[in-house]
């Protein structure tokens, strides 16, 4: 592990390490997407190399987590080859006091939702800046849409009071394309008072594959903080 003086990076490393420490030998592990979860994958690889951890297999939620797992020596499998997931570890863009989440900043929320909801235990890893009183306070709700339906879905979301914006690529001309080959609308709402209902309403729009509201699924939230220049991890 590369040592860095940056306290934010150190914090992410500590949260990732704390999550990796919860994985037991023989586990089937859902591997999330994002900068903090990347450290979890790295620490899982370290534990495997040292012999502290044995006989685990990971199920990646994105091309990013698949590439990192191969890089750090974490064996992989697919949902076709297993009948359960013991533990999933993933990040979030927002976490409310009820442990409801907004995810999808990396456009991987569809695969993440499949894996995270299947897991017997779902661990969320975030920094303290991701904690909010109400979902949608800072982050828009990502909605994955099949390309041919982008216009009718946009119109339907506007009728719900949402303000959708097509996510554009960085270092790529045109819109972001998900691992499933779809577009992402980032939708802002003035207030998300009932995330459970909003998740269902959005998913009932024809052409929507999945949205980034995750409700009633997180078992443990590990929160990283920096105090007096030192990284700390606490549990919600």
UniProtKB/Swiss-Prot annotation:
SUPFAM superfamilies from the UniProt entry: D-ribose-5-phosphate isomerase (RpiA), lid domain (SSF75445), NagB/RpiA/CoA transferase-like (SSF100950)
One Pfam entry name: Rib_5-P_isom_A
CDD domains: RPI_A (cd01398)
Pathway participation: Carbohydrate degradation; pentose phosphate pathway; D-ribose 5-phosphate from D-ribulose 5-phosphate (non-oxidative stage): step 1/1
Record GO terms (molecular function): ribose-5-phosphate isomerase activity
Purpose: Catalyzes the reversible conversion of ribose-5-phosphate to ribulose 5-phosphate.
PANTHER family: RIBOSE-5-PHOSPHATE ISOMERASE (PTHR11934:SF0)
Family: Belongs to the ribose 5-phosphate isomerase family.
Name assigned to this protein: Ribose-5-phosphate isomerase A
Organism this protein belongs to: Nostoc sp. (strain PCC 7120 / SAG 25.82 / UTEX 2576)
Organism taxonomic ancestry: Bacteria, Bacillati, Cyanobacteriota, Cyanophyceae, Nostocales
